[in-house]
Amino acid sequence: HGLIGLTKTVALEAGPHGVTVNAIAPAYVRTPLVEGQIQDQAKTLGIPPEEVAEKVFLAQAAIKRLIAPEEVAELALFLASEKASAITGAVFPIDLGWTAR
């Protein structure tokens, strides 16, 4: 929740200067770090990595897959563009429906 408060506070302070401030809050993104965590859990639990991803990492997600880094990048590019110049103080979950629960 600290990220949300910081985003809103800085957005209010920076807005008069023409600066927008937003945050992206992704769930599990397919990165080497996450892939390593899945492998570690697979060894610990004695189950295949695919099962770890689905039953452990994505158990609460409505969409059962990891997020592609490009999906996060596309949102970041949009938020940094002139097309998003009226958007500030917002937090964008890219969480496969996790926060919908």
Task: Please report, for each region that a protein language model flagged, where it lies by residue.
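Conserved catalytic helix of short-chain dehydrogenase/reductases
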Residues: 1-13
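Conserved cofactor-binding/catalytic machinery of classical short-chain dehydrogenase/reductase
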Residues: 2-5, 30, 67-68
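Catalytic Tyr-x(3-8)-Lys segment
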Residues: 40-70
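C-terminal substrate-recognition "lid" of short-chain dehydrogenase/reductases
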Residues: 63-94, 99
